[in-house]
C-alpha cells in the first residue's frame, strides 16, 4: 500500500513538473513569420502614390531623359493641399516619385544638374520632396520615396560609376527628409534612352547590376523603420500587375533568392507561393486615372467610388495593401 501511494505521488509530481516545463518553454513559430515592421505596414491598408515631375509638363508617361529642365515650372504648387486631400480621402501615407526613369530629380541633389535646382520653380530654390515631407508631418501622413534605378538621362548608366551616383542619391533622400515609411524600387530597368546624348538602348544584368543587397543595407542603416518595396521585396513585393488587385488566394510568402527586378514569372506574384520561405506580402499599385502622370485628356476618366471600393476589396480584401496613384 505504501509503495503504491509513493508511486502515485512520484507520478503526479513528474506530471506537474513536465507541465510546468511546457508552459515555461517558448513554442517555436512556424516559419516564416512577419516582422513587427511588416505587420505595422500592412495595417496601413491604403496609402497614396504621387507621380509628378518633368513628365507632367511634357505630357509623357516615360520621359526619354532629354526634356529641358526649364519646362518644369509649376505656378501654384501647394503640397499642403495635396496632403489635406489625401487625408480627406483616407490615405495613411504618400510616396513621391523623387526620380522617375527620365532621371529628373525633384530635390536639389548634388549628384546631377538634371534636377529641380536648375528649373524656374522658386528660382531654383524649390524642393518638392522637402515640401511634401513637411506637409505630411503637418497633417499626420506617413512619407515615402520612389527612386528609379533606371536612369535614361545619365551617360554612366550601365557602368560601375552609375552605381556610386545612385547610392549617393539614395543616401540624400534617406538622410534629409525625416522618417520614411517605405522606399520604392521600380522593376523597369534598361532599354532605350538619351544616356548623355548617346541615344541608344542599354541592357543590364537585372539580377546583379544594381547590387541590391548593398542598397538594402543602406536603407536599413539610415531608415530602419522603412519597408523596402521591390519586385521580390524584401519588405513587400509587387503584385504582378498595375490593375490594383491581388489573387483571391494571395500568400504573403515567396521563395527566397528567386524573384528579382524583371522576374519572368511575374504573374505568379499576385498569388504568392504557399510553400515560400520568405515573408514578403503584396502591394497593389494602381492609378486613379488611366495614366500614372497627369494628362489633361484623361480628366473625364477618373475612377468612380464604386471602382475604388471594388479595388479595395480585391487588394486589401485579398491580403495585400492598396497603393493608389494620384497624378498631379
Task: Locate predicted features.
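Bacterial Sec-dependent N-terminal signal peptides
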Residues: 1-22
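Mature catalytic domains of secreted/periplasmic carbohydrate-active enzymes
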Residues: 21-328
